[in-house]
Design a protein with these regions (language model features):
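Hydrophobic h-region of N-terminal signal peptides that target proteins for export
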Residues: 9-18
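A domain-start/cap signature at the N-terminus of enzymes
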Residues: 17-63, 75-76, 90, 117, ...
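Short substrate-entry loop that stabilizes the transition state in hydrolases
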Residues: 57-105, 157, 170, 176-178, ...
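Cap/lid segment of the alpha/beta-hydrolase catalytic domain
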Residues: 96-126
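Conserved acidic catalytic loop of the alpha/beta-hydrolase fold
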Residues: 127-145
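Short beta-strand/loop motif that positions the catalytic acidic residue
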Residues: 194-196, 200
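Short glycine-rich catalytic loops that host catalytic nucleophiles or stabilize transition states
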Residues: 197, 249-255
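Conserved alpha/beta-hydrolase "acid-adjacent" motif
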Residues: 202-207, 258-260
Length: 277
């Protein structure tokens, strides 16, 4: 019994150290060069995001919103997803979430995240999107045909929510380890790229497969896909759409992580799918 307790304490201590290490990594992350914090007043609350405007690029610019996962930080996403290095020609926006209830990992709502339905959290993050989009369009030459949203986990689910709530604003969305919630389905076809780990312990792979099926129905996609790309640990398949809204599924053998190759494939997919293609 004593040996069992010692083993249990060792495992718990290791898990605690791992969690502490991840927290320190999140807090210590600094914004990449060129990413500048901007702020907006949304319903009397100061909201912030890191914004990267490319240098030396002329003409209307693509605009990409990149939403961190629950408990995440905009600085960590901007630095560790590699988006500024891979996409050098788009305006990139990394918003910072507020404390949010998560039924899966944070029932008390202590960590930052995004609303999970159209009406949850008073709709605050949808209004944040509206305010940021309007302001950025005033300040910069934004290409209306190339406005995109992507994210990881809760941020991926929020991109799906934007498809439901703001379909006319977007050209396409990207999801890494997220899912389309059952309490609201989009009705307007939209190109989607979805990265999923077959061993995801949090957003179960079966849930993500159900999302694939729902997206194919909404977008009028073929049941059988064709090879599209291999990148990092990802093997991607494209499902052609009769409505001009293809689905790409990029699968890997891992879990809930932001998988290697995700950003490269999302950048390519967005470039291939402007609005009205």
């Amino acid at each position: 019994m004593r040996r069992f307790l010692l083993i249990l304490l060792t495992v718990l201590a290791a898990a605690s150290l791992s969690a502490q290490g991840k927290i320190r990594e999140l807090l210590a992350a600094k914004a990449p060069e060129g990413c500048v914090e901007q702020s907006w007043d949304v319903d009397g609350v100061k909201r912030t995001a890191l914004v990267r405007v490319p240098n030396g690029v002329t003409g209307p610019l693509a605009l990409v919103f990149c939403w961190h996962g629950h408990g995440g930080r905009s600085t960590h996403s901007a630095r560790h997803w590699g988006y500024p290095e891979i996409d050098k020609t788009s305006i990139l926006v990394f918003p910072q979430g507020l404390p949010t209830v998560s039924p899966l990992v944070d029932k008390e709502g202590r960590m930052p995240g995004w609303q999970t339905s159209v009406t949850s959290e008073g709709g605050r993050d949808l209004r944040l999107f509206d305010v940021m989009l309007a302001d950025l369009k005033k300040k910069h030459a934004v290409d209306e045909r190339r406005i995109y949203s992507m994210g990881h986990s809760n941020g991926a689910a929020f991109s799906y929510l934007l498809w439901q709530a703001r379909p006319d604003a977007l050209a396409a969305i990207g999801s890494v380890a997220g899912s389309l919630r059952g309490d609201g389905k989009p009705t307007t076809p939209l190109p989607v790229i979805h990265v999923a780990g077959k061993k995801d312990p949090l957003v179960k792979f079966a849930w993500q497969q159900a999302t694939f099926a729902a997206v194919r129905r909404i977008n009028g996609c073929a049941e059988e896909g064709q090879p599209w790309a291999k990148e990092g640990v990802l093997d991607a398949t494209i499902y052609a759409s009769s409505k001009g809204a293809p689905l790409v599924t990029a699968l890997h053998e891992g879990g809930h992580e932001y998988a290697k190759g995700s950003t490269e494939l999302i950048v390519r997919f967005f470039r291939e799918n402007p609005k009205g293609k």
